[in-house]
Regions:
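C-terminal or mid-to-C-terminal helical accessory/interaction module adjacent to the motor/catalytic core
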Residues: 111-192, 210, 388, 394
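Conserved segment of the helicase C-terminal RecA-like domain
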Residues: 80, 90-131
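Acidic, low-complexity intrinsically disordered tails
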Residues: 443-451
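A short beta-strand element within the Helicase C-terminal
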Residues: 56, 63-80, 114-118
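Alpha-helix C-terminal capping/helix-coil junction sites
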Residues: 49, 199-200, 405, 424
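Conserved C-terminal RecA-like helicase domain
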Residues: 1-51, 56, 84, 89-95
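C-terminal helical accessory/scaffold domains
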Residues: 192-201, 205, 210, 215-392, ...
Length: 451
């Protein structure tokens, strides 16, 4: 078991309480698996379970699909889950339960497998058998009819030249699962609404537009669809068109570009899940809003319900700001009531959105492109600007880079010219890494230089 516990600690640039807790559990042959873990933590746990060194694994549905992790026995304790639309616990779908049970006794791994569902009484036992063992699975339904999906896919079809008229659009949609399930006529108003949005926000142009919710068949040919340069760029970046519009509005704002304003902008997009602001935190974040409003590139909404979501996005932006200011991960977990996996997921998505923003800025506000690109790299690594040159060195993350910088090694050349014994004394470096770092050859080109 030492192999896995060693990988947990040595492979981390920053060891957190989650690593310590997992280490204690793995030493006893058990572990847990959920979306709050980092990719590194999940990979180590999956490896240990696959190699049968970890005997029991407690998991959320993260293991239900997409991970080839067979088990001799799968036990499902809870058969309900909270559903916010019903404001109550609802039964898990048959398809999801069968997907979980499918992990037991996989061909090529076991001769047989066991799937166990826990019933609290005989009545529930009968219900479980009828529903999950003898019942039919739910039908697969198309999600193309939702506005976010329609926005993204219609723009993509137009930008790629797959469709160029509304007639071709309807013909294409009829051949999808969405069309085959007969949903097209039910959502015609939504399709028209999405087209209006794309046109209004300068993502597409519609020539020969016919007013009215329902378009006569003989008029559809005359409506030609064409993506604008902005629409093509948004489609190429594969972000929600609404995200592109939000980013453009921020870049066109009179507020000078700044790190908090840029991070709050990407937090406002539908492509990132924002942190929830609890009732007892509301006053705190309202205070933050009053103190920081001058730096925010998107003004707060007037409506109270919208203001609540605005504060969620502000909380997310502040988490990202703390990340690039090198706040220890353990402090971030406590301050924002989150997990290492959630932090990494936010950081990864933020990096992608900042890249998209830098690409869009070339069309909207070229003067801000360099600032955004720099912030993207800082987000990806969680560092202040001064550490950027050190991050180009292999095996150096944000914590080791800070240790090197604080010890006086502020450039790649100073590290290269150092003695291994000098480097090994720095926290987080050690003898092996010190030998590797000392005497490194100059890279062909440095991306960042301290000035």
């Amino acid at each position: 078991m030492k192999q896995y516990t060693s990988e947990l600690k040595s492979g981390a640039d920053e060891v957190t309480s989650v690593d310590s807790n997992l280490t204690k559990l793995i030493e006893r042959g058990v572990a847990y698996h959920h979306a709050g873990l980092t990719n590194r933590q999940r990979q180590i746990i999956e490896k240990g379970f696959r190699e049968k060194r970890i005997k029991a694994l407690c998991a959320t549905p993260t293991l239900a699909a997409g991970v080839n992790l067979p088990a001799k026995r799968v036990i499902i304790r809870d058969l309900t889950r909270w559903d916010s639309s019903f404001q109550s616990n609802q039964p898990l779908p048959v398809l999801e339960i069968q997907q979980m049970l499918g992990r037991a006794g996989r061909p090529g791994f076991d001769v047989d497998g066991e799937g166990v569902l826990i019933a609290k009484n005989n009545e529930q036992k009968t219900q479980i058998v009828e529903t999950y063992f003898e019942g039919e699975t739910e039908p697969v339904l198309s999600r193309l009819g939702s506005e976010p999906a329609l926005r993204t896919h219609l723009l993509s079809l137009i930008a790629s030249g797959t469709i160029s008229t509304t007639e071709e659009m309807h013909s294409f949609l009829k051949r999808t699962l969405f069309g085959a399930q007969g949903e097209l006529w039910r959502t015609q108003h939504r399709i028209n609404k999405v087209l209006d949005f794309l046109e209004k926000e300068d993502l597409i142009e519609i020539e020969g537009k016919v007013d009215g919710e329902f378009i006569p068949a003989n008029a559809t040919i005359q409506e030609k669809l064409k993506a604008t340069p902005f629409g093509k760029k948004v489609s190429q970046l594969y972000i929600d068109p609404l995200s592109g519009v939000i980013i453009r509005k921020a870049l066109e704002s009179e507020v000078p570009p700044n790190s908090l304003g840029l991070l709050h902008t990407i937090a406002r997009t539908p492509d990132i899940y924002s942190l929830y602001v609890r009732k007892n935190e509301m006053e705190t974040y309202l205070t933050h809003l009053m103190q920081m409003e001058a730096d925010l590139m998107l003004p707060p909404p007037v409506e109270h319900t919208e203001l609540e979501f605005y504060l969620w996005d502000l909380k997310t932006a502040l988490l990202l700001m703390d990340w690039v200011e090198e706040t220890p991960e353990e402090h971030l977990m406590k301050r924002y009531s989150t997990t290492p996996g959630d932090i990494r997921a936010k950081v990864e998505t933020a990096g992608w959105l900042l890249y998209s923003m830098s690409e869009l800025s070339e069309l909207v506000s070229p003067n801000t492109t360099k600032m955004i690109a720099e912030l993207e790299i800082r987000i990806s690594n969680g560092v202040r600007k001064e550490l950027l040159p050190l991050l180009e060195i292999d095996s150096i993350g944000r914590v080791r880079a800070r240790s090197l910088f604080n010890a006086g090694f502020t450039s790649q050349s100073s590290i290269r010219d150092a003695k291994p014994s000098e480097l090994s004394e720095i926290p987080g470096i050690g003898d092996k890494l010190a030998e590797k770092l000392a005497g490194r050859k100059d890279p062909e080109q440095m991306r960042f230089e301290l000035v």
